[in-house]
């Protein structure tokens, strides 16, 4: 089981040290190494028809670890002067996808790179046109 709270502590703008550490700690044990664009793909099943997507960069202005407060099952940033956002939209998606993979739910799981700076990871993936793309009926994005 993955700790959502621990994952939310990472402030990870694209190409930052915190993003690299996040990917190494949380993504690579399940997904293996990323493609040349920084995207992670994991497939469960034979020609799955659903794709689940999120991304591993956040809109934080700085790289590092943020302090969080958990009160009455609500998570918030401890100090808004040291962090400009929680980063919960994409991080919750990554957390959910890791748990779905652990449960063996069939699908193509994609965690894109560089989404907060122009959707570069998803655009590159579509341009590469991997074979599994033609088998999909739908993509469910866990980003908002």
Pin down the residues of each PLM region.
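Short, conserved beta-strand segments within well-ordered enzyme catalytic domains
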Residues: 41, 51-53, 110
């Amino acid at each position: 089981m993955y700790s959502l709270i621990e994952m939310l502590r990472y402030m990870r703008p694209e190409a930052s040290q915190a993003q690299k550490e996040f990917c190494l700690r949380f993504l690579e044990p399940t997904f293996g190494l990323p493609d040349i664009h920084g995207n992670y793909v994991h497939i469960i099943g034979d020609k799955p028809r659903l794709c689940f997507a999120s991304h591993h960069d956040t809109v934080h202005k700085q790289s590092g670890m943020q302090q969080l407060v958990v009160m009455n099952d609500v998570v918030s940033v401890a100090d808004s002067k040291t962090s400009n956002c929680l980063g919960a939209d994409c991080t919750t998606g990554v957390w959910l996808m890791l748990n779905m993979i652990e449960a063996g739910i069939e699908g193509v799981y994609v965690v894109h790179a560089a989404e907060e700076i122009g959707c570069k990871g998803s655009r590159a993936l579509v341009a590469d046109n991997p074979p599994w793309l033609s088998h999909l009926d739908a993509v469910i994005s866990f980003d908002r």
